[in-house]
């Protein structure tokens, strides 16, 4: 499953790392239970809670045609104490 797009590194997400909370963008069609099951299976950790919100798409325009970028969902995953996951870094070329 490739539901997790990439990890998010903002001031808030870096601050939340101290509380054992990890932030990442996921596909908008993914559900909380799918992401929770995938994180627990892939990383071998226990998830306590998950918070999510949808990010607004940005407006784009090409000539007379107006559109918007794809919407993403941002998940904040809280792990049990003692567990951690490595940062999800997308390799960009």
UniProtKB/Swiss-Prot annotation:
**Where is it predominantly found?**
plastid
- One GO-annotated biological process of the protein: translation
What InterPro entries does the annotation carry?
A: Nucleotide-bd_a/b_plait_sf, Ribosomal_uL23-like, Ribosomal_uL23/eL15/eS24_sf, Ribosomal_uL23_CS
Keywords annotated in UniProt: Chloroplast, Plastid, Ribonucleoprotein, Ribosomal protein, RNA-binding, rRNA-binding
Q: Among its keywords, does the record have Cell membrane?
A: no
Q: Which GO terms describe its molecular function?
A: rRNA binding; structural constituent of ribosome
Q: Which GO terms describe its cellular component?
A: chloroplast; ribonucleoprotein complex; ribosome
Q: Where does it localize?
A: Plastid, Chloroplast
Show the Gene3D superfamilies listed in the entry: 3.30.70.330
The record ties this protein, via PANTHER family, to: 60S RIBOSOMAL PROTEIN L23A
Q: What does this protein do?
A: Binds to 23S rRNA.
Question: So what family is this one in?
Answer: Belongs to the universal ribosomal protein uL23 family.
Subunit note: Part of the 50S ribosomal subunit.
For this entry, the protein name equals: Large ribosomal subunit protein uL23cz/uL23cy
Q: Which organism is it from?
A: Acorus calamus
């Amino acid at each position: 499953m490739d539901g997790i797009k990439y990890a998010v590194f903002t001031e808030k997400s870096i601050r939340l790392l101290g509380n054992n909370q990890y932030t990442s963008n996921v596909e908008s069609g993914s559900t909380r239970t799918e992401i929770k099951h995938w994180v627990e299976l892939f990383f071998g950790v226990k998830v306590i809670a998950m918070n999510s919100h949808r990010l607004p798409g940005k407006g784009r325009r090409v000539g007379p045609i107006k559109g918007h970028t794809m919407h993403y969902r941002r998940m904040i995953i809280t792990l049990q104490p003692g567990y951690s996951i490595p940062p999800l870094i997308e390799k960009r070329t």
